[in-house]
Amino acid sequence: MKVQPSVKKICEKCKVIRRHGRVMVICDNLRHKQRQG
């Protein structure tokens, strides 16, 4: 999980979602998991 000021999709499988008011990226590739913070 990377915590970054701005989250972006890295590949086509990445999905940007909101959980508990946080913007997150989820993907099949676990290296692509990101959270905005």
From Swiss-Prot:
One of its GO terms (molecular function) is structural constituent of ribosome. InterPro entries: Ribosomal_bL36, Ribosomal_bL36_sp. One of its GO terms (cellular component) is ribosome. SUPFAM superfamilies: Ribosomal protein L36. PROSITE patterns: RIBOSOMAL_L36. The keyword Oxidoreductase does not apply. GO terms for biological process: translation. Keywords: Ribonucleoprotein, Ribosomal protein. Belongs to the bacterial ribosomal protein bL36 family. This is Large ribosomal subunit protein bL36. It comes from Nocardia farcinica (strain IFM 10152). The lineage of its organism: Bacteria, Bacillati, Actinomycetota, Actinomycetes, Mycobacteriales.
